[in-house]
Structures are given as structure tokens and as C-alpha cells.
Regions:
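Extracytoplasmic/secreted envelope proteins and their assembly/folding machinery
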Residues: 40, 116-123, 146-149, 189-196, ...
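Active-site-adjacent mobile loop/cap segments within catalytic or ligand-binding domains
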Residues: 162-170, 211-269
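Sec-exported extracytoplasmic/periplasmic mature domains
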Residues: 120-132, 153-157, 196-205, 243, ...
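Signal-peptide-cleaved, periplasmic/extracellular N-terminal interaction regions immediately downstream
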Residues: 1-85
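Structural recognition of the beta-strand scaffold that forms the well-ordered cores
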Residues: 85-89, 132-137, 159-163, 171, ...
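Solvent-exposed loop/turn segments at secondary-structure junctions
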Residues: 92-95, 109, 138-143, 165-170, ...
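Active-site histidine-acidic residue metal-binding/catalytic motifs
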Residues: 68-151, 155-157, 169, 175, ...
Length: 269
């Protein structure tokens, strides 16, 4: 079907309950995959589905057959258009556990549990301060990184904050807090600096500074977005702090202050 594709985009009609069209574009070696004549294929979803799961592509003698299962958008909390909307992303979930390291008592601690605990605290702080708050994960299950980004875009969020925990197995003494932003986003960089400064001041965490990264949730979101690496689980002392409810509260109060500091630097909504 795509064998005659030339440089420049073209589209194919489809008969599908999930997809409205298939677009394709023949590239040279400009997508970074290291292969000549890269073909990029985009599947456009019909209304009523926010993303598709279980996509299969089967080649046949007469063409290519594409099937998928639609996934309906999850129910969202009420959003007041007169307030700022912040999407909070608790890193990992029940399938992608994230880092797993033992605490001082030898009990395995899961990154997914720490991030969700911190996000719940941050949610409560921001709600109390008058923000709209949307969670990408409220429990053990969540969409993948692209689905989390799409959710933030769909609710037209003003800010996106992803909470994670770091690890450095070869340097167990390493500790501290990093905040990441997408390399080409000046607004995300400014947001990252505001969060980094406030979170470190509130918690006393070692300030590792801000850094750029090509993370999916930073690249695919349309708003100012940051990913906070709250500390190193491979450092037993820092892991003890990360597990402490009081420390988590101070840390998230700092992140919330960074949210406010950044938004206060912008024209009023």
C-alpha cells in the first residue's frame, strides 16, 4: 500500500470503527533512526476515542490490514475555566514499577508507591490553593507515557508536573533533587527553575539543578512541563526521607510554591 509513497504527505481512506484516516510520509534519513527511506505512518482516531490499544498491522497480498481496540476517554473532574489547571503525573504504575530498592530494614520500596503518595499530597495542596487538578494516575493503573501526555493536552492544562524518584546503583552516596524540562521549551525551563528552587528550599534537599531531557511526557505535552526527580532511592538515608510522610509534605509544599511562583511571573489569567 505504501510502496509508492514519495516525499510529502499523503492519506488513505479507511473503513474502521476506530480510525478515520491513515496518513503517511516518505522521509530520507532525517528521523534519526539510521535507516534510509523511513516511512512515517499516522493513524487518525475517530471521535469518541482518545487513544487506541492492541494495534495490529498485517501485511497481505492486496495491502495492509490495521485493527485496534478503541479506548474511551476517562471521566475527568469538573474544570473551572477561570482557574489554572495543573496535571499531576505519578511516575510509573502497577505494571511499570519504576525503581525498587530496600530501605534500612531491608524492606523493598517501590518508586510507584512513593510517587503516588507525593502526588496525592501535591494534589491536596493545589486544590486547597484554588487550582484545577487532574491526575494521570489515581491508583495502580494508568495509560502509557503518550496517553498521559494526551490527557494533559486534552484538558488544555496550564502546567504538567511529573513526580519520580532517582537511582544511581553504582554511586550509592549520590543524593539530591533534579528538575527536568524539554530542551527547546523556554517556558518549561523557567518553570523547572521555579520548582527546583522552591522544592529544595522547602525540603532541604541537595540542589542538583535543572537539566534538559527528551522525556516523552515533556516532549509530547503542549504546556509548560517538568519532571521532578525527588531523590535517590539508592541512597539509604535519602530513601528514608522519601518514605517519611512529613518530608514528603514539605517537599510537595515546595513544588506547589514553585507552581505559584512560575504562574505569578506570567500575565494574570
Amino acid at each position: 500500500v505504501f510502496s509508492g509513497a514519495l516525499e510529502g504527505e499523503a492519506a488513505l481512506p479507511v473503513d474502521s470503527d476506530v480510525f478515520s484516516s491513515v496518513r503517511y510520509n516518505q522521509h530520507g534519513d532525517d528521523l534519526g533512526y539510521g535507516y534510509p527511506h523511513t516511512l512515517r505512518v499516522v493513524l487518525d482516531l475517530k471521535g469518541g476515542a482518545s487513544y487506541a490499544k492492541n494495534i495490529t498491522v498485517e501485511a497481505g497480498s492486496s495491502g495492509v490490514r490495521i485493527t485496534a481496540t478503541p479506548s474511551v476517554s476517562p471521566e475527568l473532574p469538573p474544570i473551572d475555566p477561570n482557574k489554572y489547571t495543573v496535571v499531576l503525573d505519578a511516575g510509573h504504575d502497577g505494571k511499570t514499577l519504576g525503581a525498587v530498592y530496600p530501605d534500612a530494614n531491608g524492606v523493598d520500596i517501590y518508586e510507584k508507591d512513593l510517587t503516588l503518595s507525593m502526588v496525592y499530597k501535591l494534589r491536596d495542596i493545589l486544590l486547597n490553593e484554588g487550582y484545577n487538578v487532574v491526575l494521570t494516575r489515581d491508583g495502580e493503573t494508568a495509560g502509557d507515557l503518550y496517553e498521559r501526555s494526551e490527557l494533559a493536552n486534552r484538558v488544555n492544562a496550564d502546567l504538567f508536573v511529573s513526580i519520580h524518584c532517582n537511582s544511581a546503583p553504582t554511586v550509592p552516596t549520590f543524593q539530591g533533587l533534579y528538575t527536568y524540562y524539554y530542551p527547546t521549551s523556554s517556558r518549561s525551563k523557567a518553570f523547572a527553575q521555579a520548582v527546583q528552587d522552591a522544592a529544595c528550599a522547602a525540603s532541604g534537599a541537595v540542589d542538583r539543578g535543572i537539566a534538559s531531557a527528551n522525556f516523552v511526557v515533556l516532549r509530547e505535552t503542549n504546556m509548560a512541563a517538568v519532571l521532578v526527580e525527588t531523590g535517590f532511592m539508592t541512597n539509604v538515608e535519602e530513601l528514608t526521607r522519601l518514605c517519611d510522610e512529613t518530608y514528603q509534605q514539605k517537599l510537595m509544599e515546595g513544588v506547589a510554591r514553585g507552581v505559584g511562583d512560575y504562574l505569578n511571573s506570567l500575565p494574570r489569567k
